[in-house]
Amino acid sequence: MFKKTKITILGATGSIGDSTLAVIRETNDFEVFALTAFSNVEKLAELCQEFKPKFAVVPDLSKKQKLQSLVTDVEVLVGESGLEKVSSLAEIDIVMSAIVGIAGLKPTFAAAKAGKKILLANKESLVTAGHLLIDEVVKNNAQLIPVDSEHNAIFQCIDNHDKKCLPEIDKIILTASGGPFRDKQQLHELTDVTPEQACNHPNWQMGRKISVDSSTMVNKALEVIEAYWLFSVSADKIGVLIHPQSVTHSIVRYVDGSYIAQLGVPDMKTPIANAMYYPKRGSVNVESLDFTKYQLTFREACFERFEALKIVFNNLQNKNYAANIVFNAANEELVAAFLNKKIKYLEIIEVNKKVTKELNFENPKNIEEVFEIDRKTREYVDSVLG
């Protein structure tokens, strides 16, 4: 008898959640076991009515009451304990970790400790605690499969489960669209950028925070950290190229001079389906790539123009993993301030440079220390912003 794969979707109402559910609608291979949301209770209720999960998770009691008033045939859990439960129950086969921000850390760790197949879209799990998460994955025989289009591309280009291939890798090259301001070469051209302009990504449909991160190249800087942990490579073996068409998602250069790249139209259903079905491949409805319609171009990502990259590469080269926690937490606070029109666009990176330079912590030995560094950084940023 055919048994559907049971999946928990952490962050079901976000853009990754949307694409994951789109894949599930197109196939008959998955059963939604649990859905979680932070603020959009109405959308979560609609998804519960459509997919009939056993559990739904919301952050507090007021949202629980609201959800229960909208749907009656789902068990509603609350807060961190609820997230960790639906990430680790024995019935679950796959956990899609798509919560935005450090809030995704604990449920991702819970899934790793339970030995689950984790589809990782939550950057912060690796950015802030990569050394700790990889240890848990290895120790508990879990699987960690990247969902970001760039990392999933690398995952497809190398045999990631055969560590013998890693010495054969000469360079991992992450591609970046460059965001909406990729053709503005001077920072002074960005002085009066508005949140609406920063969120207008030319290639991808994404949430507001990640759209801003793409425009500042912080998103790519965080992906450099992820690649460092996911593929066990040193910082000097990671490169970044601006690729405006977003067709070549990443490239691996081998020591014999061979290059292997993964290409596809910019549609998140492709990497998500790849991760969901791995080690097999499933059929999903995505546009075919017509090579006759594209001219693929690449150029260097200038560290002076995109200073976020410079900060992160310096942190990795010095093995200063705590500084990446500071960088990430400061960025979250500063992007929120920008979206609320409390600071100028260029201050996102300017203030982050100042904060990352002034705050010094030892590398965390456990997840509690990660949260402590994160908390202290946010408090410091708040004091700087007044």
Swiss-Prot record:
Enzyme class label: oxidoreductase
UniProt binding sites for Mn(2+): 148, 150, 223
Molecular functions (GO terms): 1-deoxy-D-xylulose-5-phosphate reductoisomerase activity; manganese ion binding; NADPH binding
Binding site for 1-deoxy-D-xylulose 5-phosphate: 123, 149-150, 177, 201, 214, 219-220, 223
Assigned keywords, A-Z: Isoprene biosynthesis, Manganese, Metal-binding, NADP, Oxidoreductase
EC number of the protein: 1.1.1.267
Function statement: Catalyzes the NADPH-dependent rearrangement and reduction of 1-deoxy-D-xylulose-5-phosphate (DXP) to 2-C-methyl-D-erythritol 4-phosphate (MEP).
Family statement: Belongs to the DXR family.
NCBIfam families: Dxr
Protein name: 1-deoxy-D-xylulose 5-phosphate reductoisomerase
